[in-house]
Amino acid sequence: MATTDIRLSIAHQTRFAVRLASAISSPSHAKGSSGNAAFSPLSLHVALSLVAAGAAATRDQLAATLGAAEKGDAEGLHALAEQVVQVVLADASGAGGPRSFANVFVDSSLKLKPSFKDLVVGKYKGETQSVDFQTKAPEVAGQVNSWVEKITTGLIKEILPAGSVDSTTRLVLGNALYFKGSWTEKFDASKTKDEKFHLLDGSSVQTPFMSSTKKQYISSYDSLKVLKLPYQQGGDKRQFSMYILLPEAQDGLWNLANKLSTEPEFMEKHMPMQKVPVGQFKLPKFKISFGFEASDMLKGLGLQLPFSSEADLSEMVDSPAARSLYVSSVFHKSFVEVNEEGTEAAARTARVVTLRSLPVEPVKVDFVADHPFLFLIREDLTGVVLFVGHVFNPLVSA
């Protein structure tokens, strides 16, 4: 797959990410003024690309929703997944970074097609396991949850809720993403102090804020400010960063999320590209554990067929029963923690606003994240988005 095609596919993947982020951040899905959320669009993208690999007639709709460059271009999705797994998610860095895991749990009464199994193992670097859903569904659910707990080093202990699989379940496609990064410039914990954070309902809470007097990557606009916090690099070329998108208005998160979803190039146009001196610089510590069942949200994005009796997943298993297979649920859970050390998480046309004229004493930029904001973690060379979320109340962890 050509470099241009990969970049186009990544742009489509980013649009998928921000559309989901907008849906999760909308008032209808957010849980009041304390509904913090975090999810991995990349993890969902990889899992649904696996479904596309096993789909026949359903493939066009999956490819369109996931942002394939052309109609029904499942090969493009797999090429992107292969590039992402081998380049972005290869955890060869001593400084940490992401690790991705895929696993297909299939009932022992079915046999995976060799072509599908080869794709899982070859391009997605995943595994397949034969299990007994028909007589041991609760035990299999426990097995899946134990697998997730192990590969996320205990950050996520359960992905399948009680009763989510039963004797009619035939397949579980699992994908997990774990990320740990240390800031290039860590915050001094002795300077962390409780400050006021304003909630959407007009009230406020006291929460620990990190601060710094060092120059920061910040871009300023009329309606928002964007902060870039780079993570330490290892021995490779990958560059991971967290971005904090802070609307100017205390209740501006909804409008910001909508802009992200309707203007695919919005993020690239607002990237901070250079460091600026800071005046007040305060960022709250936060920890988010967020899980949701994603099928209704995906249906809202136009992905209907895989969840219906019209689903055609006949390229997944070698059996007459393949015609009756469909996706019943999509369970997703993420954990993100931001503190003085860095981040632990599981699950170019950019322009910078520069000073008109540089005075002898550079103008200092304030960045005080004391009201609801969006955040994302991405790999900067490729633009791949690993995690997206929003913070309504830093004191609420779940």
From Swiss-Prot:
It comes from the Eukaryota. One of its GO terms (molecular function) is serine-type endopeptidase inhibitor activity. Pfam families: Serpin. InterPro entries: Serpin_CS, Serpin_dom, Serpin_fam, Serpin_sf, Serpin_sf_1, Serpin_sf_2. Transmembrane segments: none annotated. Expressed in roots, coleoptiles, shoots, leaves, embryo and endosperm. Residues 342-366 are annotated as: RCL. Keywords: Protease inhibitor, Serine protease inhibitor. GO terms for cellular component: extracellular space. The keyword Zinc does not apply. The record marks 356-357 as: Reactive bond. SUPFAM superfamilies: Serpins. Inhibits chymotrypsin, cathepsin G and trypsin in vitro. Belongs to the serpin family. PANTHER family: GH10112P-RELATED, SERINE PROTEASE INHIBITOR, SERPIN. The reactive center loop (RCL) extends out from the body of the protein and directs binding to the target protease. The protease cleaves the serpin at the reactive site within the RCL, establishing a covalent linkage between the carboxyl group of the serpin reactive site and the serine hydroxyl of the protease. The resulting inactive serpin-protease complex is highly stable. This is Serpin-ZX. It comes from Hordeum vulgare (Barley). The lineage of its organism: Eukaryota, Viridiplantae, Streptophyta, Embryophyta, Tracheophyta. The gene is PAZX.
